[in-house]
Amino acid sequence: MENLEQLQERVAVSDGRAKADLVIKNGRIINVFSGEIMDGDIAIKNGYIAGIGNFPDAEKIIDAAGAFIAPGFIDAHVHVESAMVTPAEFARVLLPNGVTTIVTDPHEIANVAGEKGIEFMLEDAKGVPIDMFVMLPSSVPATEGEHNGETLHAEKLHPLYRHEKVIGLAEVMDFPSVAKGSSDILTKIIDAKKEGGRIDGHGAGLTSADLNNYLAVGIRTDHESTTAKEATDRLRAGMFVMLREGTVGRDLLQTIPAVSEKNSHRFCFCTDDKLINDLITEGSINYNIRLAIKNGIDPITAIQMATINAANCHNLPYLGAVAAGYQADIVFLTDIETVEISKVLKNGEVVVDNGVRHEAAFKQQAAVPFVSPPINHHVSLQDLALPLTKETCYVIGMQPNSLFTEKRIEQVAIQDGKFVPTVENDLLKMAVVERHHDTGCVGLGIVKGFGLTEGAIATTVAHDSHNIVAVGISDEAMKAAIDHITQTGGGIAVVNGAGQVLHDLALPIAGLLSDKSYEEVENDLAGLLNAFKQISTADGFDPFLTLSFLTLPVIPELKLTDQGLFDFATFQIISNEVN
């Protein structure tokens, strides 16, 4: 927050009575308000833009040499935990991609560690040259009846609004509770309104009629559109629509046709969940911009969606524009069509130059201490047996690069009254093992799409309750993978048919985050993918994040929790057998 002296200094620079800290000359300024490209010097004082015009003198001058000057990009909705690195490491990845602000929902770590998890994320982001705004998790757990690590009722969330980086209530996923007027979720919404915060939606699978419930209680955004029609329905209802392009949720190409010249001001971009290897190879919001431009969106419109629209969506009045009074978060683009980034400024300081981070901009701070709750279960081979009396069963049909699944009906193999996975039909066993309270709960189901020929994979990243999820050919291989990630304090493992670990990634922070650099995490993810290729014929999707979302019951159609097979249409646990 600025003080009186800083504001007076900025005014003095704006009218020419004092020198700017920095002036950027010879840039082509993208005006996100008018849609024009303008000329002019950009004068910066104390991290804010003092004015645009003729500013001949400054402590430092940068010659933009004809580069386009855009505001810093904003990711309107992201879960940092999906990158499996700490917020400080996450910032190191994002800044070269022009992302200077993120709006995050830390509900992954909150599901494991409650308020302490949220506080850890806020503390770790201190001193990092990126703005990490937090929307408080609304649905921990995501649905009633799941066993997660902690439950966050309204009275636990409310004190967290005192933190300056907390700006609202995150995606309201439990739609049935909204529809029936549950006092806990409505109290959370009222508290957010009292604090002046936005309320995010999570309208996966909702019809235009269902949206009335959302709008009636004050939910104003949504990032779950997977078609242009869904995006249009949300737009017409009065929502800001975030177009998502992540690792699994790749929806931008299907939703971008909804954007027009008349309505583009109500659209912005998000990644939601994106792995570190995809952030490195593709990018972040810069990738969304590039993809939108390739598919017919005007470059300036795409940049507006990534900047001022996102700022307006979240009521961040000093972000999202290159204009007087705005924070000096600036991206230099050598090519507006391909979004080639040459330089990034955060609060008026150069943090990236010619694609290289200025590591000095990252204040060296000691690792934030975090005591992870123990992984607590006692699963046995007997617990992994799936008894069946009928060969006709419901099967979770995994859909590559989608958060949705298909509710399939298949004929499955049975031996001695138990389900037997079959390689030729790609019908595999899936298990969710409760890991927080040693309840002994194990949900079992059948999944199609992973193409395993031997072995198993397992992970403690299992949205949103983050129990252990495994898929495999044999119970022995599944148990070997589960046992390994239990011993390492959480993580991901690939094992072969003999139960030998081919590769793993330890995630000691809540079973969700690594304590290593993002470069080391990227190397381990590459090792995991190579190991997966040794035991599977499937390709073209990330198997680990895909598996992690097969446990999220608030997205259609069929998911698996520690309670059993969950049918989104009825919002109930159902039998594996078709009656």
Swiss-Prot record:
Cofactor: Mn(2+)
Reactions the enzyme catalyzes: adenine + H2O + H(+) = hypoxanthine + NH4(+)
Organism domain of life: Bacteria
Enzyme class: hydrolase
CDD domains assigned to the protein according to its UniProt record, in alphabetical order: AdeC
Enzyme Commission (EC) number: 3.5.4.2
GO biological process, one term: adenine catabolic process
The entry's keywords: Hydrolase, Manganese
Pfam families reported in the protein's UniProt record: Adenine_deam_C (PF13382), Amidohydro_1 (PF01979)
GO terms, molecular function: adenine deaminase activity
Family, per entry: Belongs to the metallo-dependent hydrolases superfamily. Adenine deaminase family.
Listed HAMAP family: Adenine_deamin
UniProt-recorded name of the protein: Adenine deaminase
Lineage: Bacteria, Bacillati, Bacillota, Bacilli, Bacillales
Gene symbol of the encoding locus: ade
